């Protein structure tokens, strides 16, 4: 039996201009909800209304990209009357982000006479930790040095080693075919 958790967060905001008096009700309401299910994606729904109008609801699948709001917005923690909880009971809402696993990434420095290749351990919420210095091609055999380093790390899977070495090969080949020029 599968268990689904439904978390959502709500935010209201009001627009204000010098000639406009703020009302006690928000003019727009944004609700972000996610279902913790492997195949689902977070969803965003936005309601906008004027006093005396029925809210128009818009939704989109991917809320990852937001435009910056105009500078004349005032944020409010009030909920519209239809969504406010009864007195004495407060609804608590939590937004849960899925956990990302740490991963090993390939970094490179593209120069005119050399290309540098290095490995970093990327830890979500913390940053990156360098696993190797930059190995430069064609001064030394950067691919062989990278392979030796990857083999010395038993916690990196064989499949991921092959993937990283293939990426390094592709980058070195691209650098060689372009003669070091990006243009």
From Swiss-Prot:
The keyword Transport does not apply. It is found in: Plastid, Chloroplast. Its main location: plastid. InterPro entries: PSRP-3/Ycf65_sf (IPR038447), Ribosomal_PSRP3/Ycf65 (IPR006924). This is Small ribosomal subunit protein cS23y. Keywords: Chloroplast, Plastid, Ribonucleoprotein, Ribosomal protein, Transit peptide. It comes from Arabidopsis thaliana. Part of the 30S ribosomal subunit. GO terms for biological process: translation. The keyword Ribosomal protein applies.
């Amino acid at each position: 039996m599968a268990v689904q958790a439904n978390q959502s967060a709500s935010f209201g905001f009001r627009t204000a201009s010098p000639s406009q008096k703020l009302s006690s009700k928000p003019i727009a309401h944004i609700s972000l909800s996610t279902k913790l299910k492997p195949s689902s994606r977070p969803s965003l729904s936005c309601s906008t209304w004027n006093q005396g109008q029925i809210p128009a609801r818009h939704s989109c699948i991917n809320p990852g990209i937001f435009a910056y709001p105009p500078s004349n917005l005032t944020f409010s923690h009030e909920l519209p009357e239809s969504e406010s909880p009864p007195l004495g009971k407060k609804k608590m809402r939590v937004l849960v982000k899925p956990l990302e696993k740490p991963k090993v990434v390939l970094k490179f420095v593209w120069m005119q006479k050399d290309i540098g290749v290095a490995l970093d351990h990327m830890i979500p919420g913390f940053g990156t930790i360098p696993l190797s210095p930059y190995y430069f091609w064609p001064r030394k055999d950067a691919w062989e040095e990278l392979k030796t380093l990857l083999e010395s790390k038993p916690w990196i899977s064989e499949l991921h080693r092959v993937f990283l070495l293939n990426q390094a090969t592709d980058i070195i080949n691209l650098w060689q075919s372009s003669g070091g020029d990006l243009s």
